[in-house]
Every structure is written in structure tokens, then in C-alpha cells.
Amino acid sequence: MVEPLLSGIVLGLVPVTLAGLFVTAYLQYRRGDV
């Protein structure tokens, strides 16, 4: 019963983590560009 929950958590965290890294990199790029 743990695997479905674990896979759900992973599938939920991966996009959020990638989005967070993309946003931080974008903000740093914008801040460094100006």
C-alpha cells in the first residue's frame, strides 16, 4: 500500500521541483542581465 502513495508523492514533487529550479534560474538570469 506504500508504493502508490510514494509514486504519487514523487510524481507530485518532481514537476514542482523542476518548476522551482526553472523559476529561480530565470530570476537569477533576469537579475544578472539588468
From Swiss-Prot:
**UniProt entry keywords in alphabetical sequence:** Chloroplast, Electron transport, Membrane, Photosynthesis, Plastid, Thylakoid, Transmembrane, Transmembrane helix, Transport
Alphabetically, the GO molecular function entries are: electron transporter, transferring electrons within cytochrome b6/f complex of photosystem II activity
GO terms for cellular component = chloroplast thylakoid membrane; cytochrome b6f complex
Major location category of this protein = plastid
Q: Name one Pfam family in it.
A: PetG
User: Which sequence ranges are marked TM in the entry?
Assistant: 5-25
Matching entries from SUPFAM superfamilies are given as:
PetG subunit of the cytochrome b6f complex
Source organism's superkingdom?
A: Eukaryota
Sorted alphabetically, the Gene Ontology BP terms of this entry are:
cytochrome complex assembly; photosynthesis
Query: Partners and quaternary state?
Result: The 4 large subunits of the cytochrome b6-f complex are cytochrome b6, subunit IV (17 kDa polypeptide, PetD), cytochrome f and the Rieske protein, while the 4 small subunits are PetG, PetL, PetM and PetN. The complex functions as a dimer.
Q: What does this protein do?
A: Component of the cytochrome b6-f complex, which mediates electron transfer between photosystem II (PSII) and photosystem I (PSI), cyclic electron flow around PSI, and state transitions. PetG is required for either the stability or assembly of the cytochrome b6-f complex.
Q: Which NCBIfam families match?
A: PRK00665.1
Q: Name the family.
A: Belongs to the PetG family.
Instruction: Please report the name of this protein according to its UniProt entry.
Output: Cytochrome b6-f complex subunit 5
Q: What is the source species?
A: Oltmannsiellopsis viridis
